[in-house]
Amino acid sequence: MDKFVKLTGVAAPLPVVNIDTDMIIPKDYLKTIKRTGLGTGLFAEARYNEDGTPNPDFVLNKPAYQNAKILVAGDNFGCGSSREHAPWALLDFGIRCVISTSFADIFYNNCFKNGILPIVVSQEDLDKLMDDASRGSNAILTVDLEAQEITGPDGGSIKFEVDAFKRHCLLNGLDDIGLTLEKGGSIDNYEKATAASRPWA
């Protein structure tokens, strides 16, 4: 998993509440267990017309936001079914950070496990960030996980809180396997001690 220390990039505004995982990645894309390639299905029902052509009115199809790294979204983002394909699709598109006033718990935790930083802010701060994100190609935000701070295009900053353990994992690029490997020495010592004390086992 890639480390997340500081991210600077275009932020796309998506001022819609209750965006569920089916909206993020429709069920037609759930047949694969590969994490790559799902970016094409991200927000597919809103992003494409019925004939498969891009919907020019959808934010991620607009030239200024086609390479967005940050998503500023409405309340209760990621609700619905607990499909891990949702963060996979966001990540494959190139989005490493989602900012909202609240997230569904399972989606929130899945983001951390897949290298995405979900940030909870107040409605007042979200309104400011949504305004910043509406500037098109000038909608540049910097998200500093070490400082726990978001800096807008005008230099104004917003502080945010994140669980210390989850922060440690993202800063060091540790998924569940990485966490286990980080404790490799302790595991080896335990196995050796157990083998010495229980030679019959």
Curated annotation (Swiss-Prot):
GO terms for molecular function: 3-isopropylmalate dehydratase activity. Keywords: Amino-acid biosynthesis, Branched-chain amino acid biosynthesis, Leucine biosynthesis, Lyase. Catalyzes the isomerization between 2-isopropylmalate and 3-isopropylmalate, via the formation of 2-isopropylmaleate. Pfam families: Aconitase_C. Heterodimer of LeuC and LeuD. One of its GO terms (biological process) is L-leucine biosynthetic process. It catalyses: (2R,3S)-3-isopropylmalate = (2S)-2-isopropylmalate. GO terms for cellular component: 3-isopropylmalate dehydratase complex. The keyword Nucleus does not apply. CDD domains: IPMI_Swivel. The gene is leuD. Pathway: Amino-acid biosynthesis; L-leucine biosynthesis; L-leucine from 3-methyl-2-oxobutanoate: step 2/4. It is an enzyme of class 4 (lyase). Belongs to the LeuD family. LeuD type 1 subfamily. Its EC number is 4.2.1.33. It comes from the Bacteria. The keyword Amino-acid biosynthesis applies. This is 3-isopropylmalate dehydratase small subunit. It comes from Rhizobium meliloti (strain 1021) (Ensifer meliloti).
